[in-house]
């Protein structure tokens, strides 16, 4: 059983090798090499893409941290001012100038507009409106027992506001706006008549209304953005503000206004070393504020669909990146600003950068390697194909007689032995026909060897056309042929032999110009049915002996037994 299994495995391998062939194996090898080279290149592309994304995030993080530090500085100043205001409300300074300011307030509080100023060089003036105007506002009120303390606290905060406000800061204006009808601002009010307009401009802003106890229950710092009206000459601003409370009473709002243009200038300064990519600042509602590219302010602005896609991505993380068409968009939420900083990197910018150069080089290398691989495949494939054709031709020549195109003696014996063994295994008959052309030497002597060759070729064609599909014929001598008939009984083999004899004898063939001859053959037939012997050489010897009996009996005959 083990021997049979081993033989079956070897037979299966041989069939597979014949089915595939050298050309298919070459194709398979080159496909595997191309596949692995493509996978390695793809892996390098993935690593390169990860490095590119990390680089984009690092650039964005550096700018975001720098912007956050400046904004944090302003928020810290705002918290410091609120703490100072609270202390001043609880324990005001007992200065004569401050008491005089309270007295002056009592004298002018009924006036339409008023201004209290201690020392213009050291502190900021308090600008206010009348009691009547205050009573008209829903959020405004002077029904406060600590109103005098708030007046003095506002003057003290005015001193701190003057110190905190400087030209190097991003803040354009710092102010305290009270619910009691007055305000202190680093931007002076030149004419008293403008105080009511300016005050009501403050108290109607979202950054003031948004700090009511209902709107801002946690009393935290909040950011607001203001977009200019179409008919207004004012520019967009970002305002950070915080409510001022003491003893559960809301006094007013401290705020700082930052023009969007200063943020734009900061972004431009922050990316001087990184020329590629555009930085964009958005508020918490993803409304565009400013860009680091003033020359093309709307070049990379997102449409509503892209903004919705970006907002959906931002819901899951405070930082990240996505691809939009030919752009890579990375974002990071700021810690001290209620908004997000976005970096847009286009495909053209990426191609011009270091990663673009590496990507192009990698693509060219892969294309060059693939081209060389295909050329090598073509050359080797042609070489193997030619060698395979040559091998097949040499093998055919080694197994066949070139004149008759039948098997030669050695090949016939190689074919006969396994066929005889197979028939013996399955108990099928195995027959042999031996054929010899009559008077062939006389034809050679009379008409020449070329005529003899034509006779042999003609006879071989007639013999082949008389056989069954499973029969095998070969040339075993000069004018001798042998036919193997696996599975044919002696009677069937004799019928085949008779058919061969008739075909050979019936047809005339042209030997020379106007010269035709008719050939004949003597045939001997043997079969394993007679003795049970499946030895091919013994059967051939028996058929050969009967062939000579046919010649002795007058030629052009078939002898299938010794007694016929």
Swiss-Prot record:
Membrane-crossing residue ranges in chain numbering: 20-40, 360-380
GO molecular function, one term: diguanylate cyclase activity
EC number: 2.7.7.65
Cofactors: Mg(2+)
One Pfam family here: CHASE7
Biological-process GO terms, alphabetical: cell adhesion involved in single-species biofilm formation; cellulose biosynthetic process; negative regulation of bacterial-type flagellum-dependent cell motility
Ranges where the GGDEF domain occurs: 428-563
GO cellular component annotations of the record: plasma membrane
Pathway recorded for this protein: Glycan metabolism; bacterial cellulose biosynthesis; Purine metabolism; 3',5'-cyclic di-GMP biosynthesis
CDD domains: GGDEF (cd01949)
Catalytic activity: 2 GTP = 3',3'-c-di-GMP + 2 diphosphate
Keyword GTP-binding: yes
Cellular localisation: Cell inner membrane
Active site residues per record: 479 (proton acceptor)
Membrane topology note: Multi-pass membrane protein
NCBIfam families: GGDEF (TIGR00254), PRK15426.1 (NF011955)
Job of this protein: Catalyzes the synthesis of cyclic-di-GMP (c-di-GMP) via the condensation of 2 GTP molecules. Cyclic-di-GMP is a second messenger which controls cell surface-associated traits in bacteria. Involved in the regulation of cellulose production.
Protein name from the UniProt record: Probable diguanylate cyclase DgcQ
Record gene name: dgcQ
């Amino acid at each position: 059983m083990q021997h049979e299994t081993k033989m079956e495995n070897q037979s299966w391998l041989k069939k597979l090798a014949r089915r595939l062939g050298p050309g298919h194996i070459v194709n398979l090898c080159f496909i595997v090499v191309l596949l692995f080279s493509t996978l390695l290149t793809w892996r390098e592309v993935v690593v390169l893409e990860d490095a590119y994304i990390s680089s984009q995030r690092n650039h964005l993080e550096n700018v975001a941290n720098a912007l956050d530090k400046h904004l944090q500085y302003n928020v810290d100043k705002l918290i410091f001012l609120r703490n100072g205001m609270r202390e001043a409300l609880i324990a005001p300074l007992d200065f004569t100038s401050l008491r005089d300011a309270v007295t002056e307030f009592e004298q002018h509080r009924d006036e339409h507009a008023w201004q209290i100023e201690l020392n213009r060089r050291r502190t900021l003036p308090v600008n206010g409106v009348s009691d009547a105007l205050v009573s008209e506002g829903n959020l405004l009120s002077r029904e406060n027992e600590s109103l005098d303390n708030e007046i003095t606290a506002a003057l003290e905060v005015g001193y701190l506001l003057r110190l905190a406000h400087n030209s190097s800061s991003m803040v354009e204006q710092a102010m305290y706006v009270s619910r009691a009808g007055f305000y202190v601002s680093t931007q002076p009010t030149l004419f008293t008549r403008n105080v009511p307009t300016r005050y009501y401009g403050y108290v109607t802003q979202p950054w003031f209304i948004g700090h009511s106890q209902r709107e801002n229950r946690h009393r935290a710092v909040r950011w607001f953005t203001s977009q200019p009206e179409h008919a207004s000459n004012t520019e967009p601003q970002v305002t950070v503000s915080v409510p001022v409370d003491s003893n559960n009473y809301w006094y007013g709002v401290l705020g700082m206004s930052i023009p969007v243009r200063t943020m734009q200038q900061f972004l431009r300064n922050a990316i001087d070393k990184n020329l590629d990519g555009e930085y964009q600042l958005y508020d918490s509602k993803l409304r565009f504020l400013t860009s680091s590219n003033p020359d093309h302010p709307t070049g990379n602005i997102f449409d509503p669909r892209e903004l919705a896609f970006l907002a959906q991505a931002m819901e899951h993380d405070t930082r990240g990146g996505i691809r939009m068409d030919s752009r890579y968009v990375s974002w990071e939420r700021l810690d001290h600003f209620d908004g997000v900083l976005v970096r847009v990197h286009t495909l053209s910018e990426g191609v011009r950068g270091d990663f673009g150069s590496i990507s192009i080089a990698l693509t060219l290398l892969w294309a060059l390697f693939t081209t060389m691989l295909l050329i090598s495949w073509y050359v080797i494939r042609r070489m193997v194909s030619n060698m395979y054709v040559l091998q097949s031709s040499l093998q055919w020549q080694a197994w066949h007689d070139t004149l008759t195109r039948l098997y030669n003696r050695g090949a016939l014996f190689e074919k006969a032995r396994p066929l005889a063994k197979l028939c013996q295994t399955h108990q099928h008959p195995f027959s042999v026909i031996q054929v010899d052309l009559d008077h062939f030497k006389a034809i050679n002597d009379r008409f020449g060897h070329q005529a003899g060759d034509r006779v042999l070729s003609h006879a071989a064609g007639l013999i082949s056309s008389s056989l069954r599909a499973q029969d095998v014929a070969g040339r075993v001598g000069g004018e001798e042929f042998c036919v193997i008939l696996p599975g044919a009984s002696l009677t069937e083999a004799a019928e085949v032999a008779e058919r061969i004899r008739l075909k050979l004898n019936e047809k005339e063939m042209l030997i020379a110009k106007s010269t035709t001859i008719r050939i004949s053959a003597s045939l001997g037939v043997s079969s394993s049915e007679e003795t049970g012997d499946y030895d091919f050489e013994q059967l051939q010897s028996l058929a050969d002996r009967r062939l000579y009996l046919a010649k002795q009996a007058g030629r052009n005959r078939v002898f299938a037994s010794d007694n016929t």
